Structures are given as structure tokens and as C-alpha cells.
């Protein structure tokens, strides 16, 4: 994603235009030029914060987290995105020329082509497996013993990559610092302190 930058409102760098490319597994690519208006910048910030603070853009290691939590987080992203679209209305989804994209176009397509298929397939399958758990079996151990867990983890990772690419575009449009891949410097201990 490259963009021409200008100083925007509130002292941040806001792009006049960026190139966007999102690879949607099993569907293809959504790409184009985004020339955001102020409402799109504000909506981009809101959705960026949502994505940056959810497990949906953080890699889910093989022995980390619960699949149910990951699906629930993605479900919440769905609702929040719809809420943002309603709040900003048509201003974030204007008609544009072929080859151009808008906040609305990107958001709705990521929901419908990436998140929705994952949730509609895996939510009922995981629920059916969860109800088989005996009371004496730990929910974490039960979920990790599911033979389809690696397959679901792989699909969650595919969606995560789409959401990460979307978050990067939102970050540029909002004109803010990267809140997802922040490098934290190593902490040094002072002599004599624990």
C-alpha cells in the first residue's frame, strides 16, 4: 500500500490516496485506489481500534487460546463493523469509478467474503463438538483434542491475514501510528533491582 500524504486534521498525516489490495482466500482479490473523505477516515479509525484490540489480528499459536474465543471475537467484529457502517451512513460508501474502493466496499466485502463463511461453517461444527464434552473433562483439553481443530485454526489464520491487510489500510487512512505491530524495546534491569 502506497499513499500520497498530507497533513490532516488533528495534527496527523492523512492520505489523499492509497492503493489497497486484500487477498480473500477462495474468492480472489479486492484491490483499488482509495481516496478517503473525512467520514471514511473517522470510520477507519474506529474499525482499526476494534481490530487492533481483538484477538482477530493476533496469531493464534497451536497451544494458545481457545477456538471458541477466536470465533466469538470475529462475531463481535461483524457486529461492530455493521454499527460503524450505520453510524457513518452513505458517506463511507459513495459511488466510485471502477478501480476505486471505499470504506464501505472494503468492510462489507471482508465481512461477507471472509468472516461470514468462516463463522457459518465452523460455529455449528464447534458447537456440536462442544456439547459432547463430559462434565469431568476440561473445556480447553476437550477443544484441543478435537480432530478438526487444526483445520479450524488454519482457516482462522487465513481470515486473520485478510483482517491484518484491512487493518493496515485502515491505519494508513486514519493517519495514525501502528498499534498492532508495535516493537517493545527489551527492558534492562538496574543493578540490584529485581
Task: Describe each model-derived feature in a short phrase.
Residues 68, 72-75, 79, 109, ...:
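Generic structural signal for well-ordered, non-transmembrane alpha-helical segments
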Residues 101-139:
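Extended amphipathic alpha-helical regions
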Residues 79-86, 90, 116-127, 131, ...:
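Charged/polar positions within long, soluble alpha-helices
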Residues 135-194:
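Alpha-helical oligomerization segments
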